């Protein structure tokens, strides 16, 4: 029976230490080989926490599946900020271009509850509300109203 280990690792910087080492060590596989493959596959997500699934079969062979980082991590990267606002309704942490919100929605679409790009983008902008990040220089709730009114349909309904 295959063993499955799911962990969050820093993109391109996984190590044999926790959380990977202790989880993989008892399975009897080459932890360094797993770490090297994870780092190769997550290099493009440098600086973000990336969900990784390692499946190990009975013959000690492994496969590494890399997930997409959380929406908040993608927003922080696109907006060039360290963290969201401690007071999202009072202080603005940064600004996210609308095109970046659409890009994030396209990346995350498969794992979201939304079926359409328009609603997925609304989910991303909604996350900006709780992070205190403006979208296109406007408060995220204004952008949500604009999306609902169809002002961004030319971008979202391609």
Curated annotation (Swiss-Prot):
Gene3D superfamilies associated with the record:
Ribosomal protein L11, C-terminal domain (1.10.10.250), Ribosomal protein L11/L12, N-terminal domain (3.30.1550.10)
Listed InterPro entries? Ribosomal_uL11, Ribosomal_uL11_C, Ribosomal_uL11_C_sf, Ribosomal_uL11_CS, Ribosomal_uL11_N, Ribosomal_uL11_N_sf
- CDD domains with a match to the protein in the record: Ribosomal_L11
Subunit field text? Part of the ribosomal stalk of the 50S ribosomal subunit. Interacts with L10 and the large rRNA to form the base of the stalk. L10 forms an elongated spine to which L12 dimers bind in a sequential fashion forming a multimeric L10(L12)X complex.
User: What does the sequence similarity comment in the record state about its family?
Assistant: Belongs to the universal ribosomal protein uL11 family.
Function, please?
Answer: Forms part of the ribosomal stalk which helps the ribosome interact with GTP-bound translation factors.
Q: What's the protein here called?
A: Large ribosomal subunit protein uL11
**Which species is listed as the source?**
Methanoregula boonei (strain DSM 21154 / JCM 14090 / 6A8)
């Amino acid at each position: 029976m295959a063993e499955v280990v799911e962990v969050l690792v820093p993109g391109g910087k996984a190590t044999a230490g926790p959380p990977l080492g202790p989880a993989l060590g008892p399975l009897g596989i080459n932890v360094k080989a797993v770490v090297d493959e994870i780092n190769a596959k997550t290099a493009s997500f440098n600086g973000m926490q990336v969900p990784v699934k390692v499946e190990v079969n009975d013959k000690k062979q492994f496969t590494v599946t890399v997930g997409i980082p959380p929406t908040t991590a993608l927003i922080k990267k696109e907006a060039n900020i360290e963290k969201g606002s401690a007071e999202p309704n009072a202080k603005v942490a940064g600004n996210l271009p609308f095109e970046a919100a659409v890009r994030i929605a396209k990346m995350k679409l498969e794992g979201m509850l939304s079926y359409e790009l328009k609603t997925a983008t609304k989910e991303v902008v909604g996350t900006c509300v709780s992070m205190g990040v403006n979208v296109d220089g406007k408060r995220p709730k204004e952008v949500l109203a604009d999306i609902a009114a169809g002002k961004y349909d030319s971008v979202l309904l391609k």
